């Protein structure tokens, strides 16, 4: 996975699978370093794994990240509030996607399963809208 940056873009476009695998490596390293010692269940040592404590932890983290998206763009709050930090909003949206990958990993799903589920759901919506 070569992804050198040139300004704000990557030379290599990562697939969903590449991103999921990279995040899986990050989570594996966090387990090895003991970063989740208060949250992981006994026997949690490799991802993906179905671990309700870590899944729950990441759902709570997702709620925090969603709040940060809303904080970066306050235009939703009322029509007078003009706070909008586009770069910060994009970074927080990326954090949300990363945390969603963690939720999937700690629910026992791999990248292929998640990608297939997303594609299936998107196609269902597309077909439903096409038939309206």
Regions found by a protein language model. Name each.
Residues 1-132:
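Flexible "arm" and connector segments at domain edges
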């Amino acid at each position: 996975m070569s992804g050198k940056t040139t300004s704000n873009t990557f030379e290599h476009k990562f697939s969903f699978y590449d991103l999921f695998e990279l995040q899986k490596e990050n989570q594996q390293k966090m387990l090895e370093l003991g970063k989740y010692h208060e949250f992981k269940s006994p026997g949690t040592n490799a991802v993906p794994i179905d671990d309700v404590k870590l899944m729950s932890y990441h759902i709570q983290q997702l709620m925090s990240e969603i709040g940060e998206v809303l904080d970066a763009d306050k235009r939703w709050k009322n029509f007078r509030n003009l706070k909008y930090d586009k770069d910060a909003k994009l970074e927080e949206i990326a954090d949300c996607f990363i945390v969603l990958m963690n939720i999937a990993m700690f629910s026992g799903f791999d990248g292929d399963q998640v990608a297939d589920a997303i594609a299936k759901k998107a196609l269902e919506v597309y077909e439903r809208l096409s038939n309206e």
